[in-house]
Amino acid sequence: MSLSTPLFEGSRKLMWLGAGELGKEMIIEAQRMGVETVAVDRYDNAPGMQVAHRKYVVDMMDKEAIIAIAKREQPDAVIAEIEAINTSALEELEALGIRVVPNAKAVKIAMNRIELRRTAAEVVKVPTTLYAFAESPEEVKKACKDIGYPCLIKPEMSSSGHGHTVIYKEEEVDSKFEEAIKHARGKSRRVVVEEYIKIDTELTVLTYRYMTNGGVVTKVIEPVEHQRPQGVFH
């Protein structure tokens, strides 16, 4: 991307769908390179909006609203920064010739736990814990019996771990299934049931890609360990 002058005709422009703390940091870096920035989120005065050139407050699940903003702004690229986005809108933006980063297919898979699990375990063949998909308490009970208690239950789609619980015995299935559905994004009643494994630590491994000399380079950042005393990340 070539450098430009924000707010002038022909300026380079990026639009963020989601304007949280991560989006704010990205917007600041983009502005240092002379990029015009647009922040979109569901609530006003989100962190990214505090530094962006322009902001929009809309329901992030409103497909038509997202498309209308993109058509108005005509950004060089749209960046998906949060999980709660209408992924169909991203697909339509690509069809309109607007670049989406990451691409709409990748975002759709990453935001859907069933598609992500299938891609990781069945397509890429990454070793994972035992798992099953279910749409009713009866199917969850069968999955837990096959996998063995305790089990994790998660909504097909949600954000920030909402709706994740551990099922220790069959009597808990009905209530914890409803808990998962209550926090689900959209109208899906599908859940993922997973083998529960007690772990000593949790690592985040970040990858990033960039283009250079006509090619794409993929690199990995050193793993970051998380600690959660009293359930709070550190």
Describe every region a protein language model picked out:
Residues 1-106, 110-111, 138:
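ATP-binding N-terminal substructure of ATP-dependent carboxylate-amine bond-forming enzymes
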Residues 109-203, 208-234:
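Active-site nucleotide/adenylate-binding loops and adjacent lid/helix of ATP-dependent enzymes
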